[in-house]
Every structure is written in structure tokens, then in C-alpha cells.
């Protein structure tokens, strides 16, 4: 069994909550993860930027945290393409871990049926 420590970066509507896409209030723009073995040793890393399709301008807070420009993302792969590569990288048997439970809600349309979700917030 391996552990996938997940870190997501996302953007949101730059014009405020009133104008956000209610079906997609947060858009993932980066998936990062490390894979740990049963001894909790790092055995691999994953990091891919994602081309945004909903919010094509950064929210001011996102911009201040990530130090990216939209030019950095314009030629990247779409979320479904990156997610497919990420799940393939995860392998067959793993447990997702994260420092922040919100990552799982952001990914919720794309859960893995072969894995358990574990968050420090449930302990």
C-alpha cells in the first residue's frame, strides 16, 4: 500500500462570489503529489499545471500566492487529461492523504474507486 500526499492549487472567480460559476466555484490549476511507500519514504513525485477553461483571469489571492501568469497555463493540458495522468501515476493500491480536507471536495467528481480517502481532519 502506498500513500499519495496530495496538494491542489486552484483559482476562483476574480469578480466575486456573485459572478462565480455555481457549478464550479473553484477550478484546479495544478495537481501536485508525492508518493510514499509503507515506510513513509518518498518514492516518486507528480506535478502538472492545468489549463483553465472557466476562470481565465486570476483571483487576486490566487495570483499573490502562486506567482503564475495565465500565460504560464495557456498551453497546458486540460483538467481531464491531467487527471487521467495523475490517476495512472497513483497506481493500483493507495491511500490519499492531504493537509487540507477541501482538496477532496474540489476533486469530488473524480474520486478513485480503487482507493480510500484519508484526511487529517477526520482524526
PLM feature segments, named:
Residues 2-104:
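Conserved non-catalytic scaffold segment of RNase H-like nuclease domains
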Amino acid at each position: 500500500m502506498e500513500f499519495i500526499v496530495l496538494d491542489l492549487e486552484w483559482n476562483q472567480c476574480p469578480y466575486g462570489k456573485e459572478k462565480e460559476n455555481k457549478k464550479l466555484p473553484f477550478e484546479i490549476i495544478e495537481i501536485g503529489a508525492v508518493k510514499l511507500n509503507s515506510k513513509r519514504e518518498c518514492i516518486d513525485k507528480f506535478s502538472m499545471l492545468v489549463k483553465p477553461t472557466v476562470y481565465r483571469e486570476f483571483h487576486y489571492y490566487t495570483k499573490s500566492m502562486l506567482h503564475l501568469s495565465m500565460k504560464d497555463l495557456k498551453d497546458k493540458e486540460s483538467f481531464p487529461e491531467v487527471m487521467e495522468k495523475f490517476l495512472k501515476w497513483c497506481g493500483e493500491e493507495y491511500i490519499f492523504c492531504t493537509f487540507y480536507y477541501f482538496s477532496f471536495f474540489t476533486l469530488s467528481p473524480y474520486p478513485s474507486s480503487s482507493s480510500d480517502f484519508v484526511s487529517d481532519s477526520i482524526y
